[in-house]
Amino acid sequence: MSDGARPRRGRFAPDFYEIQKRQWVKSLAVFDLLLAYYIFAFGGLILIGWTAIGALGGRLPFDAPGFWVKFWLIDAAVSLFVAFLQYYDARKFGGSYILKRLRAKSPDRADRYHLALENTVEEIRLAAGLPKVRAYVLPDWAVNSLALIEADGTPAVAVTEGLLADFARDELEAVTAHEIAHIARGDAFFLTFICAMANFFERIQEMFEPDFEQAAVPGTRRTQAGGSVVAAFAALSSLVVSMLGVLVSRERELLADAAAVELGRSPEALARAIFKADAHNSFVGDFNRTYGPLFIVPPKAKAGTPEAGGSWPSAHPAVARRMAVLADMAHTTPEAIIARIEDMRHDRDRAKVVFPSYEELHEGAAAPSGPAAGAASGATGLCPRCRLPLADALYEGVPVRVCRECLGKLVDQDVMDRILARTEIGFSPALVRKAEEFRQNLRRNPLKSQKRLDRISEPAACPACGYRLASRPYNYQYFIPVEKCLSCDRIWFDADELEILQILVEQAKAR
């Protein structure tokens, strides 16, 4: 195929380039509405300002020669400038800024879960007849997904680590089909534009948020008062644009669900995916609700909150309504689908590979220690305890390096969120008891536990770079003692430490 040739269209999707043209026309219509709103809003602000100035001088300016000509010229110029600036920002940087704010990353092909996502996006893209769709992963334990359009016009589908960890293959395919249906129908173009327009005001609000340190400085109140006016106007404008997103997106979710069934051929899988996302924590990243229309379910911190859809101003129909429609397509009932979710969860628990503790594997034998064991040296690729070569392995689908003798693990700090989000590994009762004993000891005296670690830890070298490992807690929420390389951002877990961390995290999430 030549560079200038268009790819052949699939049966499902209309011409992708025609969709882009139609959405361009729609975005111009939004620009016209925005300009009209600004003319009205700025006109009111200008009139209020001039009236206040005239009242102070004892003479209102409305009867002055040429007043209304100046008024309309100033109003139109300011409105056109702000509307064009916002429109240009949304078209040029909107999608990229949203991805950056959500900390989206390209899939790691060495990660089995990420590779499955990339392959699934490619399969559904081909079925839809789209020229190109990028895949992204959001480093978040929440369960959600979205579709948007990047600055260069390329569509993108992003899913969270929590979704990859919790969803079966057919559920991942159904969610991907839903997001690609939004792209093929043109929804993603328009919603990305609307959310980016609202995001413009969000950034203005952040600029004028009061600084608590400056609040006590004399002479700053007037500046803060002016900033408050601007921030209030920005908040109102953001609300207006967000309401437009709500109005255009609510029914589009139902249409995208139907189109996803045509692409993925599994209405039950999509219903399961929507229910699981709604029942889970689906709040993604650190952002306000202006991005809500982009997601498959409205971002929320807990299940059962009003944001679950259907209530104003939600951009999504009620989850119960969506499940009822999909259940009807699958010739079943929502109750049967929920029961199927529970059955699949039990099957998954039974299929877990159960990891024993180090003591169970070695029948209580101590870890081997030779004359070089624990000695700090610059040699790389060797276990810092046994001085034996490390082997490549997959742990929760993530590449790690393992010592086959002492069962220590070297893990890149960047992949820890993936490991802790996933639950394909089970743990023996002995490991669970070991984790509980650790939690109880830590609760009684965490500082004593850290001092004990510092006393017994011997100098050790990072197997990746040779830099000296430093004894540190994993973090200050999970005070598990590990050894971190401050040079290459890797963590060395001795036998059972990573498993204990996973057990504690899973118990915390279950609470």
Predicted regions and their residues:
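Peri-catalytic and regulatory segments of divalent metal-dependent proteins
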Residues: 6-8, 87-192, 196, 285-286, ...
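Transmembrane alpha-helices and immediately adjacent membrane-cytoplasm interface residues
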Residues: 67-98, 113, 122, 126, ...
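Short cysteine-rich clusters marking metal-coordination/redox-active sites
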Residues: 383-386, 403, 462-465, 485
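Cytosolic-facing loops and C-terminal tails of multi-pass membrane proteins
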Residues: 1-11, 18, 225-249, 262-380, ...
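Post-HEXXH active-site segment of zinc metalloproteases
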Residues: 187-216, 271-272, 276-279
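Short, flexible, mixed-charge glycine/proline-rich loop motifs
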Residues: 370-380, 393-397, 448-459, 475-479
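An active-site-proximal "capping" alpha-helix that borders the catalytic cofactor pocket
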Residues: 95, 122-125, 249-266
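Short metal-binding segments enriched for Cys and/or His
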Residues: 409-427, 489-506
